[in-house]
Amino acid sequence: MHVSHLQLADYRSYEAAYLELEPGVSTFIGPNGQGKTNLVEAIGYVATHSSHRVAHDAPLVRRGAQRAVIRAAVVRHGQTALIELEINPGRANRARLNRSPNTRMRDVLGILHTVLFAPEDLALVKGDPGERRRFLDELLTARAPRYAGVRSDYERVLKQRNALLKSAAAQNLHHRGGRDLPTLDVWDEHLAQIGAELLAARLALVAELQPLAAKAYGELTATQDPISLRYRCSATDEELDTTNRPQLVEILRAALLRARPDELRRGVSLVGPHRDDLQLWLNDLPAKGYASQGESWSYALALRLAGFELLRADGDDPVLLLDDVFAELDAERRRRLASYVRTAEQVLVTAAVPDDVPQELSGARFRVTGGSVERER
């Protein structure tokens, strides 16, 4: 698949922008702060409905504007889908597919697949567990858009349960073990059922990612250093070896029961997929805290490449977005990454200067300055 056209209105620094793109490599060159990242961010937003840079949509709207609009033409299996997203901070975002007004946001999820490489990826290794949970969940949703609904349902249950626990803590009800809160049992069951579905999907995904990430890490580093991905479940101290949903429901039920006294005291849910982590190991040591800067970069890139290979195996090459990544890498890692990604159907690269882009990634070149984009001839 590839994006053939991108149009922006009041998105970030762009009052208006229109790009014609093509398969292969396209490079966007310009000084920092001129809007290069905004372009790949917009394409990523079409795929995931989220930004890799900010947690909320408000910064995506140009200062002084009420809304932002992204329009993208996505070519897949010879067919073109026209996607329009209207970003409305403080209100519901809106979507159109092939100009139809009767389109829900979830209807356009899964049409465009992207894999983004960005300086923020270092947080996959060095950051908090939330970064790694987001990595897994975004990949799950890209492969099976219905998981967007599962995640939304889980977050709704979690919010309601936390509100109940917070109220119980304020009333000092923990000494009664929650007997005055019969609805807590109801929310426990909801959390166990929906949480088990999300947990099973994550566990299966990690099992698929493991060999692909190990292969990619070896190719990026030219070493035999072993890496392993281990899913750390907050409901048990043991490493889970099952994706059987009924078994996972029972594990979560038991963990919620054990945690109830502490949860009632603290007023917050302490067990569930929202507290889990994807632990990254290198040479039988936790990568977080032990891996060097170069090893951490290679690990983060290996995770992204593993995600790319999974999406490719599902039937389509995702669009690769490389945002100022090469400036962070030494010459050998640049060369190895470029050799790996150039086989993709479409690769979009941003860089401050042309020398940051490896020669292996030659193709169309755009100059980005002051919120305008022009193709070099």
From Swiss-Prot:
Binding site for ATP: 30-37
Keyword field contains DNA damage: yes
Biological process terms in GO annotation: DNA replication; DNA synthesis involved in DNA repair; double-strand break repair; SOS response
Predominant localisation class: cytoplasm
Keywords: ATP-binding, Cytoplasm, DNA damage, DNA repair, DNA replication, DNA-binding, Nucleotide-binding, SOS response
Protein's UniProt keywords contain Magnesium: no
Pfam families (alphabetical): SMC_N (PF02463)
Disulfide topology: none
Alphabetical list of SUPFAM superfamilies matching this protein: P-loop containing nucleoside triphosphate hydrolases
Superkingdom of the source species: Bacteria
One MF term in the entry's GO annotations: ATP binding
Annotated function: The RecF protein is involved in DNA metabolism; it is required for DNA replication and normal SOS inducibility. RecF binds preferentially to single-stranded, linear DNA. It also seems to bind ATP.
Family classification: Belongs to the RecF family.
Protein name: DNA replication and repair protein RecF
Lineage, highest ranks first: Bacteria, Bacillati, Actinomycetota, Actinomycetes, Streptosporangiales
Gene: recF
